[in-house]
Amino acid sequence: MPTTGNYFHLHLVSDSTGETLITVARAVAAQYANVTPVEHVYPLVRSQKQLDRVLDEIEEAPGIVLFTLLEKDLVSRLEAKCQQINIPSLSIIGPVMQLFEAYLGASTAGRVGAQHVLNAEYFARIDALNYTMLHDDGQMVDGLEDADVVLVGVSRTSKTPTSIYLANRGVRTANVPLVPGIPIPHQLEVLKKPLVVSLHATPERLIQVRQNRLLSMGAESGNENYVDKQSVTDEVAYARKLSAKFNWVMLDVTRRSIEETAAAILKLYSDRQRQRLPE
């Protein structure tokens, strides 16, 4: 295998920012823990002159070449050079575009960097992020009705990171903590538009996460109830009781990552939106 020591060169050539390439390449490279990729990222490659400089660098440090180029002349030149020096190359978007063309019966418009045009979707994400940051952890409850999704749950059920993840997908997300002995906001009780999702985890999992949190903060005494099994069990029961009372969707996050939790919520939200469409 053409590697040096325990690493290999990974060349990422893009006619745009290269973000798509980086995401895909790192996701795949992470599956090979015994070797480390040395990334060479070449964004905004849109001319023969720019590509020639890239090819010189690739030849100096041969390795895997991944690319997202739409200009056919550039693609042909890159592939020919890689074949000449006997290194693998692959278009990340080429097979996907071919599939689209075959199904839709239409060819691509060939717009370089089209995925990064500042459009309505981009501004929706910015709006969602602004809303989510302002409505984190029970803040500004008067604006809850303007949310797409409201997350509720006891401490350490990943409400905030999940909210931010959803906001990055353009979903306006608020979150409200559920604390025994503290009444929930009236605004939460009377919500009509938003999807309310109650995040749950087992007491054992919550205790583990909370203990790790205390250790990271250097906290010692004064937090007995926070990690006491009976107290945490009571919190979970309280949250479940409220969820049943207000008919909130309950989602167990005990064994879910943030991404998995967000994906489940996005599906719930999408299903709900479809149900509301006029027939």
Swiss-Prot record:
Its EC number is 2.7.11.32, 2.7.4.27. InterPro entries: Kinase-pyrophosphorylase, PPDK_reg. Belongs to the pyruvate, phosphate/water dikinase regulatory protein family. PDRP subfamily. It is an enzyme of class 2 (transferase). It holds the Pfam family Kinase-PPPase. The keyword Cytoplasm does not apply. This is Putative pyruvate, phosphate dikinase regulatory protein. Bifunctional serine/threonine kinase and phosphorylase involved in the regulation of the pyruvate, phosphate dikinase (PPDK) by catalyzing its phosphorylation/dephosphorylation. ADP binds at G153, V154, S155, R156, T157, S158, K159, T160. Keywords: Kinase, Nucleotide-binding, Serine/threonine-protein kinase, Transferase. One of its GO terms (molecular function) is protein serine/threonine kinase activity. It comes from the Bacteria.
